[in-house]
């Protein structure tokens, strides 16, 4: 299939999943994950109307941003972020979805103050017990939100999570449910609005939609099999 056909197919799958879940498809957006694909693929997706793209690696985001040189693109960082990469995130990214510790929040705040800008962020929540998964333990999130509330440079929009890597649908669904309930709890107890739930990828987005996801991070279903990582 062409890229346009793949995008259309995924959009239809999302529409049907929303229908089954009794949700408005307008409440769920697709975030194309362009990691490991070249900037020409991003350019093709832009021709289809896409302007937001997610990257795991800061260096790859920077390379594509420089190659494309288009200020209309919104780059979203979704991978684990080392504090020594904060400068590049502040320069090139419009959103960070992997805020998972106070040290990183402090480093971001310092750089953002120097740059005179704000950054949309999502707190990454660890919703399973897999050692390979990163993110903040759910029980630590409420206090973390209170702590960083004074950081005017960080615009906390909601939560992101990666569900357990398993074929058991119920275990995947519970990961998403856990994060949605945590979001609801934080909104109720802290009187704040956290509209974004970035949950669900190519293999599990239908379950994420059932549990209230507002943003799906879709890569291979849109772009095809990933090329080898350089």
Ranges and model annotations:
Residues 213-230:
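Gly/Pro- and small hydrophobic-enriched strand-loop and loop-to-helix capping segments
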């Amino acid at each position: 299939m062409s890229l346009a056909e793949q995008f259309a197919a995924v959009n239809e799958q999302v529409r049907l999943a929303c229908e089954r879940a009794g949700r408005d498809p307008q409440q769920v957006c697709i975030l194309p994950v362009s990691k490991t694909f070249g900037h020409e693929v991003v350019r093709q997706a832009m021709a289809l109307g896409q302007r937001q793209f997610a990257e795991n690696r800061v260096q790859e985001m920077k390379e594509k941003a420089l190659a494309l040189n288009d200020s209309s693109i919104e780059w979203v960082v979704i991978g684990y972020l080392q504090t020594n990469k904060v400068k590049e995130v502040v320069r090139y990214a419009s959103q960070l979805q992997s805020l998972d510790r106070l040290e990183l929040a402090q480093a971001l705040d310092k750089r953002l103050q120097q740059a005179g800008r704000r950054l949309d962020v999502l707190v990454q929540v660890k919703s399973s017990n897999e050692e390979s998964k990163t993110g903040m333990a759910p029980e630590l999130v409420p206090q973390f939100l209170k702590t960083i509330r004074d950081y005017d440079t960080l615009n906390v929009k909601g939560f992101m999570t990666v569900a357990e890597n398993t074929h058991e649908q119920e275990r995947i669904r519970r990961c998403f449910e856990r994060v949605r309930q945590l979001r609801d709890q934080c909104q109720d107890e802290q009187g704040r609005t956290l509209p974004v739930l970035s949950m669900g990828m190519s293999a599990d987005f239908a379950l994420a939609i059932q549990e209230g996801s507002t943003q799906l991070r879709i890569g291979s279903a849109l772009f095809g099999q990933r090329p080898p990582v350089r």
